[in-house]
């Protein structure tokens, strides 16, 4: 197999498995660069490069940290693809391919952003005081650990790096001067406010706000569409097409009442209970004494009522099976035709999740794990399985229920723990530490 064929196969593989991670990391790096250009004059995010308040700088620092974590996660996925590493170590002649050059340029841009914040991540909160008068600098510890992880991950692939002569980190001694920096920042702010071009900055802020509002509205609209469209498909197909067809079948076959033996047993028990209640009331003198013919007539009326009731249950169960199939088709069509909305929704969810504090993340993880795989979860699973069986008209099988409850929550718990160990530990180590402390 020659080098050209190998390169074509590797490129196709890369396009399927790694290009998505690279594109997401590149987009996050572009967002960091956009924030720097719009609000920090193209410099590193920090209070020394702007005249904003501490709360505003904290907001931007939170945004930068969220994008950096996203980049680190995607780079971790790239490093796990050995074929991707091989592509980057090909012969220089192969690297002249336009697609390869485009990939290398993206990696170069991402690496520049990571190097810029590798020395010191933006601090979003001051050190916390502890009881003995010491200082517990958790953000600095987390940043140190994260920098070590970043270095190990970037060692997985090598590519050409240019010298970053435009971005230089100034030390505190280099920044010091005759006038205080706060006074200089005030002068810069006044100059910027008096600048005739300051309206451009206002337009950029307004545009960013409109984009955020549009993203929120589109995400909520898409979620509602995912819920409403399948429900409408289910109800419309069931009411206007399926129920009339199934009812006509039962009318033509009047002897068919039950679709499983469990329904038949329940109907017999209900009729027996009615007969015993008649005899009980008769013995206590609560009603007139019925003749055998009258009692048989009442039992016949009750049997007819019970048969009609269970026939409706059987009709709905059969119609539900086909209606759910139509709902699944409608749901799939919405997903296939809404790729852009899916990307926006993913970004919206990422912003919400990354915006939560570590305590909130740990609380949600504990809530969901205890709800679905916790000590009291078997009772909830029993209710869910019984509801599904009634929905489709299936007989309730206790053996299957016990087997499901004994295996599925265990598998789900394993998946949760693997996700926490594999992904959450690399994205937010402090959230994992908080989760462990709260769980204990």
Swiss-Prot record:
Pfam family of the protein (one): CemA
Top-rank taxon, per record: Bacteria
Keyword annotations from UniProtKB, A to Z: Cell inner membrane, Cell membrane, Hydrogen ion transport, Ion transport, Membrane, Transmembrane, Transmembrane helix, Transport
Transmembrane segments: 222-242, 316-336, 352-374, 400-420
Chief location category: membrane
Disruption phenotype annotation: Loss of light-induced proton extrusion, grows poorly at low pH or in low Na(+) medium. Relaxed light-induced H(+) extrusion activity. H(+) influx activity is also partially diminished. The double mutant missing both PxcA and PxcL is impaired for light-induced H(+) extrusion and later exhibits lower H(+) uptake activity. The double mutant missing both PxcA and FlpA has both reduced light-induced H(+) extrusion and later lower H(+) uptake activity.
Database matches in InterPro entries: CemA (IPR004282)
GO (cellular component) term, any one: plasma membrane
Disulfide topology: none
NCBIfam families to which the protein is assigned, alphabetical: PRK02507.1-1
Cited HAMAP family: CemA_PxcA
Descriptive protein name: Proton extrusion protein PxcA
Species annotation: Synechocystis sp. (strain ATCC 27184 / PCC 6803 / Kazusa)
Gene from which the chain derives: pxcA
């Amino acid at each position: 197999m020659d080098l050209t064929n190998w390169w074509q196969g590797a490129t196709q593989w890369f396009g399927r498995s790694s290009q998505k991670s690279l594109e997401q990391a590149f987009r996050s790096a572009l967002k960091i660069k956009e924030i720097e250009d719009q609000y920090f004059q193209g410099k590193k995010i920090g209070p020394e490069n702007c005249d904003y308040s501490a709360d505003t700088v904290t907001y931007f620092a939170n945004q930068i940290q969220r994008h950096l974590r996203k980049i680190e996660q995607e780079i971790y996925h790239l490093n796990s693809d050995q074929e991707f590493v091989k592509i980057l170590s090909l012969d220089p002649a192969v690297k002249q391919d336009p697609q390869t050059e485009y990939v290398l340029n993206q990696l170069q841009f991402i690496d520049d952003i990571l190097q810029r914040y590798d020395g010191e991540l933006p601090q979003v909160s001051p050190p916390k005081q502890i009881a003995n008068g010491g200082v517990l600098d958790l953000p600095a510890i987390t940043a140190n650990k994260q920098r070590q992880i970043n270095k190990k991950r970037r060692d997985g692939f090598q590519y050409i790096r240019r010298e970053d002569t435009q971005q230089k980190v100034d030390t505190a001694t280099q920044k010091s001067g005759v006038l205080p920096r706060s006074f200089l920042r005030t002068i810069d702010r006044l100059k910027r406010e008096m600048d005739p071009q300051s309206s451009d900055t206002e337009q950029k802020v307004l545009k960013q706000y409109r984009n955020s509002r549009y993203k929120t509205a589109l995400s909520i609209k898409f979620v509602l569409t995912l819920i409403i469209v399948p429900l409408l498909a289910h109800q419309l197909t069931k009411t206007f097409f399926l129920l009339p067809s199934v009812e006509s079948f039962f009318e033509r076959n009047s002897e068919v009442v039950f679709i499983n033996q469990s329904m038949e047993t329940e109907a017999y028990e209900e009729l027996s209970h009615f007969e015993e209640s008649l005899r009980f009331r008769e013995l206590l003198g609560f009603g007139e004494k019925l003749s055998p013919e009258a009692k048989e007539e009442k039992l016949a009326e009750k049997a007819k009522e019970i048969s009609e009731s269970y026939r409706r249950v059987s009709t709905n169960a059969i119609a539900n099976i086909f209606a759910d199939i139509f709902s699944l088709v409608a749901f799939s069509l919405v997903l296939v035709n809404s790729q852009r909305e899916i990307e926006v929704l993913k970004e919206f969810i990422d912003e919400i999740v990354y915006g939560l504090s570590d305590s909130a993340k740990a609380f949600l993880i504990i809530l969901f794990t205890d709800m679905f795989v916790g000590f009291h979860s078997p009772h909830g699973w029993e209710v869910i399985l019984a509801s599904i069986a009634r929905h489709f008209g299936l007989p309730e099988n206790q053996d299957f229920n016990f087997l499901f409850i004994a295996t599925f929550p265990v598998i789900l718990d394993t998946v949760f723990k693997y996700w926490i160990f594999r992904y959450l530990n690399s994205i937010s180590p402090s959230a994992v530490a908080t989760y462990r402390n709260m769980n204990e």
